[in-house]
């Protein structure tokens, strides 16, 4: 499956994807603004990368550098991408980001209650390296987060 990836600064489209009703509940916490009030960060250091299967938009990844070579990722794939295509897209995304940026390590945080996201991250080749207790508030409940990552040297083997 040949997917296309492109960096975007189309903040209207980015906002539409992230605030999609099937995505927003999974990427927001108790302190995130309401979807109608939320705006994406308009900063050159943040990479919003769209993914297409042919002409069909599957969603995006947001990459936020924590250092020059270690970038945190947030996944926002639309329902049309869920399942097989999402797993393929995630693996190809890692290849693309490593080939097109200075990033050498991708990391993410997954709230402990989100078993689907944890499985998705592991299926994408990420490995758990830690746990951040009591670090995420959702629906008035304090949750811990699994810490996962993948390195260029590991992913490209």
Predicted regions span which residues?
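Conserved beta-strand-loop-alpha-helix junction that forms the acyl-donor binding cleft
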Residues: 107-119, 135-136
């Amino acid at each position: 499956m040949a997917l296309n990836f492109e960096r975007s600064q189309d903040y209207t489209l980015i906002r539409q994807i992230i605030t999609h009703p099937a995505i927003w509940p999974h990427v927001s916490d108790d302190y995130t603004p309401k979807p109608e009030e939320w705006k994406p960060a308009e900063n050159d250091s943040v990479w919003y990368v769209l993914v297409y299967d042919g002409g069909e938009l599957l969603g995006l990844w947001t990459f936020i550098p924590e250092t020059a070579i270690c970038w945190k990722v947030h996944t926002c794939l639309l329902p049309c991408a869920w399942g097989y295509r999402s797993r393929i897209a995630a693996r190809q995304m890692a290849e693309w980001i490593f080939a097109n940026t200075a990033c050498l390590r991708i990391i993410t945080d997954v709230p402990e209650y989100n078993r689907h996201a944890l499985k998705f991250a592991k299926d994408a080749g990420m490995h758990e390296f830690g746990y951040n207790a009591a670090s995420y508030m959702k629906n008035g409940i304090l949750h811990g987060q699994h810490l996962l990552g993948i390195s260029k040297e590991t992913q490209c083997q």
